[in-house]
């Protein structure tokens, strides 16, 4: 690695740390003014952003699962602006009293929410994340260091240029947001920046997340990878099931809350053809186990139906592909989920309250659903505003990582001259 590159990044990280200390002095109204100004400038600057995005898209195959994630258009930019306005409208997550008490000696204790400080994000070809992360980080009083994928470098730099312009116009340091150089080595420097970055959140493939977890010295929160199951129970309502499965698989197949494996009770194999019929209209390729394959053979398009191999279970497809697993009991379904789940989002379709209760109790995932689509795993859908990612771990945060999850806390203690006895 070039020492010049490493030294340049380290010096810049020191400047980001300095900028982070000024953010705690900002009022929520000032932060909201910045966010609303940014949201209002997206449309006037859309041409430059979309031109940069097109240059990124030209280097990527349309068949790539990443293509849809990389794509920006006017409609998506409008949605991003709306999300930023929504973040501005949310209550501040800072200086919230989490706990309060007065001790017998008269000391008054208050536990309150405070910013993390400097948050690092390593992500792949998702330029919308650049906007989302900045909005959430600023609202929660944090500075941000970004390492985007090289596939989206032009898009990210156009977006960051706009954000820096807005920050400068509000007399805030552009060092509040730092986009690392595109070189791969920059991520290595970032992951080793103990004392300069407080937390790193990787967003992307399981391979990316594993690499960051295994390499980073800075604390890491795992997000993103979703191996998502929906179990159609023997009491499941067919028409409801058709709509849920179709929505979970085809709404946006390239995102982490999309359905990967349909589990069906063996007593409902007779309904499998009807359950999957809408999927054929969307050209969904099904990898079915033997019993499911035989049930689908006469009705599902031959070119879209294949025998499942072991690797098809436990795969995050990120495309119009689906594996189907047949089980004989609820326990079998739960065991399959436990074996292959990434602990992101799991769902059951059932009319049996006992099955629903057991599923909620025993499935170990950040979000567990009954009789609805896993597509709802999203900070905005939860009423939290845009999220930085979906945490699939249990320490600090789990599920959508929105404003509160980007804060920590400190104890503030007031006294009247008390001293601790020897």
Curated annotation (Swiss-Prot):
Entry EC no(s): 1.2.1.41
GO cellular component: cytoplasm
UniProt KW keywords: Amino-acid biosynthesis, Cytoplasm, NADP, Oxidoreductase, Proline biosynthesis
Record field: catalytic activity: L-glutamate 5-semialdehyde + phosphate + NADP(+) = L-glutamyl 5-phosphate + NADPH + H(+)
Enzyme class: oxidoreductase
The keyword Oxidoreductase is annotated on this UniProt entry: yes
Keyword Hydrolase recorded: no
Protein known as: Gamma-glutamyl phosphate reductase
Species, as recorded: Chlorobium phaeovibrioides (strain DSM 265 / 1930)
Gene name per UniProt: proA
